[in-house]
Amino acid sequence: MTEPVTQPALVIPQLIVGLGNPEPKYDQTRHNIGFAAVDALARAWNISLAENRKFQGQYGEGTAPGGVKIRLLKPLTYMNRSGQAIQAVTSWYKLSGESVLVIYDDLDLPLGKTRLRLSGSAGGHNGMKSAIAHLSTQNFPRLRIGIGKPKNAVNGDNSETVSHVLGKFSATETQLMSLVLQFVVECVELSLKQGVEKAMNRCNSYTVEAPKS
């Protein structure tokens, strides 16, 4: 008699976290695209975000399409301490690590590309290093949004990279990124309805194109 094949459990996010830095000077910068993604989700789902001292961030909860209860978080701890805020929410609500979806910027992906994964390393991203340290696992989903590399990047020239990630998108890039954020909402909604693994097929195979002028 053959053993029944057990299907892996669906990974459905319950807490969605966007990474960024809290000061106004960081608004609209490439490094804050995670914040922008959570703002886009909050608008799409009519969820109000408000500062929550206990959770060290801007926090809100509501219902996503399909009737899924969802929590949104923008840590206000600065990027390299993001995990503190994430852990504050997961501890309070007794959420597992794999129920947390973290959205953040990625230099290694070109503009218009996104990557959804079920687990993985921090890849040099300080916010993700903190998230992994505080959740004590790498096994949680993450959605990376491509911000591209600096045009004049020289290997080993960290100053060029820093000014790129902390710089703002050009007018043309801003148009493209608004479309990317719409696509991010689509990918996250698919994750909530069908699980992260199913959503990966859509999210990882599509490139958002700049609007034709």
Swiss-Prot record:
Query: Where does it localize?
Result: Cytoplasm
Mind telling me which residue stretches traverse the membrane in this protein? none
EC supergroup of this enzyme: hydrolase
Q: Which GO terms describe its biological process?
A: protein quality control for misfolded or incompletely synthesized proteins; rescue of stalled ribosome
Q: What is its main location?
A: cytoplasm
Keywords of the record: Cytoplasm, Hydrolase, RNA-binding, tRNA-binding
Q: Where is the active site?
A: H31
Alphabetized Pfam families for the sequence: Pept_tRNA_hydro (PF01195)
> Location of site Discriminates between blocked and unblocked aminoacyl-tRNA?
N21
**Subunit:** Monomer.
What is the stated purpose of this protein? Hydrolyzes ribosome-free peptidyl-tRNAs (with 1 or more amino acids incorporated), which drop off the ribosome during protein synthesis, or as a result of ribosome stalling. Catalyzes the release of premature peptidyl moieties from peptidyl-tRNA molecules trapped in stalled 50S ribosomal subunits, and thus maintains levels of free tRNAs and 50S ribosomes.
Q: Detail which positions bind tRNA.
A: Y26, Y78, N80, N126
| Catalysed conversion reaction | an N-acyl-L-alpha-aminoacyl-tRNA + H2O = an N-acyl-L-amino acid + a tRNA + H(+)
Task: Please identify the protein, giving its name as recorded.
Answer: Peptidyl-tRNA hydrolase
EC number, UniProt record: 3.1.1.29
Segments forming a coiled coil? none
Q: Which InterPro entries match?
A: Pept_tRNA_hydro, Pept_tRNA_hydro_CS, Pept_tRNA_hydro_sf
The family line of this record is: Belongs to the PTH family.
| Disulphides | none
What do the Gene Ontology cellular component annotations say?
cytoplasm
PROSITE patterns associated with the record: PEPT_TRNA_HYDROL_1
Among CDD domains, the record links this protein to: PTH
Tell me which residues are marked as the site Stabilizes the basic form of H active site to accept a proton: D105
- Molecular function terms from GO: peptidyl-tRNA hydrolase activity; tRNA binding
